[in-house]
């Protein structure tokens, strides 16, 4: 654009500035007064050309060219000082500033913006500083929260009761503890101290062992039986092996009815159905099994109960009794006869051994030794005569 249109555009862009036109050979050239700075173009966009992004008018200032050589650094220090970055730049001499920052255009923009506007490099450097400060504050908050959590967890762990390691007893310690338990289930303080000295265990461990041992003993010993036989074999095994009577609770329930009893399988005879309803007249037949045996054992006196397992039962057959008598007759050989037979057998074995090793024994003597062996075997196998039985005590 040239001529009047260019002048009009320049006037519209900078109405506050007064320009004078000088004609040099038919061409118009604007002459700028020394008091106003030359117009600066911020950009070539539509908004910049139309003046939509026009900056507010500033006070007139002297051109940079009128300033002396050292005034550029002073002006820069005065502007950059309040922003917080002029301290570092003030220490640098005029020759130390880069050529780009020492140009009048840079200082001109600084002077034009004034103290309120911060430099763009300063803003760019200040934002990371703020971000670093925020990150550091966040990290401090996290570290403080982690410390609080760690302290709370430590306090909780201290509050919780530490789990004690399980005590492993040696065989000697268990033997001593069992001996003391057989003597007294509730040992006094003196007994516990003596056990602690013997077993080298703390007294509280001994007390806990006795508590556990008493609980185990109560579990084994039934409250209605109170016998080690009941604990070993249970109800069925104790009744079969040792003829222990049934508990009173089962007997009372059997009087009301077998099906209503606690253990009908112990009352009903083998081979009879349990689900069937029985009348009271049929109860004796049902009680002919294990219940009958338990009732007989309950009716016997105390002295007879001790001897009952040793006495032969009346239900044994005659063949079994005969076999027992024969075995008893064979076992009635006197001790002297058994001793003589064993001595003779040892002598015969010694002679055979010497004959084989030394070869000094004649074959006739070997035959005699064999005959003696056979005679001893016949004596042991033959049952004793009735006269010998009478002689023997």
From Swiss-Prot:
It holds the Pfam family Homeodomain. Belongs to the paired homeobox family. It is found in: Nucleus. Residues 316-340, 367-381 have a biased composition (Basic and acidic residues). A motif (OAR) lies at residues 341-354. It comes from the Eukaryota. Residues 121-165, 304-393 are annotated as: Disordered. The gene is vsx2. This is Visual system homeobox 2. The lineage of its organism: Eukaryota, Metazoa, Chordata, Craniata, Vertebrata. Residues 222-296 form the CVC domain. A motif (Octapeptide motif) lies at residues 44-51. Residues 162-221 bind DNA. It comes from Oryzias latipes (Japanese rice fish). PANTHER family: VISUAL SYSTEM HOMEOBOX 2. One of its GO terms (molecular function) is DNA-binding transcription factor activity, RNA polymerase II-specific. One of its GO terms (cellular component) is nucleus. Keywords: Activator, Developmental protein, DNA-binding, Homeobox, Nucleus, Repressor, Sensory transduction, Transcription, Transcription regulation, Vision. GO terms for biological process: regulation of DNA-templated transcription; visual perception. Acts as a transcriptional regulator. Mediates the differentiation of V2a interneurons. Plays a role in eye development and organization of the neuroretina. A motif (Nuclear localization signal) lies at residues 147-151.
């Amino acid at each position: 654009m040239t001529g009047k249109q260019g002048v009009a555009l320049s006037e519209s862009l900078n109405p506050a500035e007064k320009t004078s036109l000088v004609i040099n050979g038919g061409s118009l050239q604007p002459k700028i007064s020394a008091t106003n700075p030359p117009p600066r173009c911020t950009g070539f966009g539509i908004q910049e050309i139309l003046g939509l992004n026009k900056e507010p008018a500033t006070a007139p200032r002297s051109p940079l060219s009128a300033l002396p050589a050292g005034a550029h650094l002073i002006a820069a220090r005065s502007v950059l000082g309040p922003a917080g970055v002029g301290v570092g730049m003030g220490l640098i001499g005029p020759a130390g500033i880069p050529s780009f920052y020492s140009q009048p255009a840079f200082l001109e923009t600084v002077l034009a913006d004034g103290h309120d506007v911060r430099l763009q490099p300063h803003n760019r450097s200040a934002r990371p500083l703020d971000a670093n400060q925020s990150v550091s504050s966040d990290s401090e908050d996290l570290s403080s929260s982690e410390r609080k959590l760690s302290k709370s967890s430590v306090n909780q762990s201290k509050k919780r009761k530490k789990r004690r390691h399980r005590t492993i007893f040696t065989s000697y310690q268990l033997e001593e503890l069992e001996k003391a338990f057989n003597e007294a289930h509730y040992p006094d303080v003196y007994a516990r101290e003596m056990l602690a000295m013997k077993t080298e265990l703390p007294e509280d461990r001994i007390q806990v062992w006795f508590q556990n041992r008493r609980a185990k003993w109560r579990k084994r010993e039934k409250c209605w039986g109170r016998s080690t036989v009941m604990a070993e074999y249970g109800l069925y095994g104790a009744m079969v092996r040792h003829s222990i009577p049934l508990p009173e609770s089962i007997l009372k329930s059997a009087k009301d009815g077998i099906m209503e009893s606690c253990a009908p399988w112990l009352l009903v005879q083998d081979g009879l159905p349990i689900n069937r309803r029985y009348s009271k007249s049929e109860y004796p037949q049902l009680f002919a099994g294990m219940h009958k045996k338990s009732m007989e054992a309950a009716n016997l006196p105390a002295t007879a109960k001790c001897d009952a397992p040793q006495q032969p039962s009346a239900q044994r057959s005659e063949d079994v009794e005969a076999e027992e008598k024969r075995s008893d007759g064979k076992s009635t050989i006197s001790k002297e006869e058994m001793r003589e037979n064993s001595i003779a057998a040892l002598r015969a074995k010694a002679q055979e051994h010497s004959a084989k090793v030394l070869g000094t024994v004649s074959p006739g003597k070997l035959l005699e030794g064999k005959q003696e062996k056979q005679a001893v075997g016949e004596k042991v196998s033959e049952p004793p005569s009735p006269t010998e039985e009478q002689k023997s005590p």
